[in-house]
Amino acid sequence: MALETLQIEHVPSDHHVYAALFRDVQNVDFLQAQLIGKNPEFEYAFIDASVIISRTHLFAAIFRALNTLTEGTLQTPNVHSDIVIGLSPTNNISESYRRYGLTPSKTRDVLVIKIVYPKLSSENSTITSEQQPTPESIWQHLTTHIQGTPVPLTNEELAKSTDWAKVRKYYKLNGVPGVERIDKADEEGRRKEMEGLVISGIALRGL
């Protein structure tokens, strides 16, 4: 099973984060339609993997969204869409969806994030763990509905998807002193340098 349980520090113990990476997804239009239609069975963060440079980059957006969830300050209808907009260095929500979410005919590789946490039922009582989705049920749902190849969520696999031109454009790194001097032949070195710049952009959003 390629669904990974992510360990993120300073997250409440009853909040669980699951993630998977699918390559060459053939039904991005279907997945986007479920999001637009607000299908509750598809309450995930679907992210275009081409704009992600590392696990740390992804973790930064997840951590920010979990903070807004626990503080009751979500900017969007749910924590999953807050993860998507949390990748952006700007406060433009619609632009964030376009750039970091799914785009039929353009998105090939898809990152999926699922947050499972205690919710209140209509009777204002906490949903029990038996009623919450399990890693197994999440994985079964994803593999049933995503027409793509699951691969491990590693920096090496993410590097195969990263579109550096997009990253530089979206995070306004073109022309930034030092960026042009990054050795493009040193993939690991470039990832580390760019990672710091990108995460700084995310952290400074809204300040």
Curated annotation (Swiss-Prot):
Its main location: nucleus. Coiled coil: none annotated. The keyword tRNA processing applies. Signal peptide: none annotated. GO terms for biological process: tRNA threonylcarbamoyladenosine modification. PANTHER family: CGI-121 FAMILY MEMBER (PTHR15840), EKC_KEOPS COMPLEX SUBUNIT TPRKB (PTHR15840:SF10). Component of the EKC/KEOPS complex composed of at least bud32, cgi121, gon7, kae1 and pcc1; the whole complex dimerizes. This is EKC/KEOPS complex subunit cgi121. It comes from Neurospora crassa (strain ATCC 24698 / 74-OR23-1A / CBS 708.71 / DSM 1257 / FGSC 987). The lineage of its organism: Eukaryota, Fungi, Dikarya, Ascomycota, Pezizomycotina. The gene is cgi121.
